[in-house]
């Protein structure tokens, strides 16, 4: 009996993890740059992080001009929400995700308006 339960448990876990893997592949990454760029930067960001907003405002334009637009670098943005507001904003960012980073820049540019709730 223990052997049957163990086998069923292993089958169940294997089935559940394969379903999860298929779902995670359907998430379209927000990125900019050529797919075949030699360098890919993966940026883990929280949409309520002031440092991340500063990166999008002050560093990213130069990075885009000097490296991304020339096809040398590709940047991929991944959500790493640090609070519930960032989590909800990341869901908004994925809702109408065309794979481009415009929504990220819009959310970061208006971060001071939406990230802090009234207490």
Each language-model region and where it sits:
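Positively charged n-region of N-terminal signal peptides that target proteins for export
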Residues: 1-4
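Bacterial Sec-dependent signal peptides at the C-terminal "C-region" and cleavage site
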Residues: 15-23
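A short beta-strand-turn-helix
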Residues: 23-39
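Short pre-active-site segment immediately N-terminal to redox-active cysteine/selenocysteine motifs
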Residues: 40, 45-48
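Structural alpha/beta surface segment adjacent to cysteine/selenocysteine redox centers
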Residues: 45, 53-119
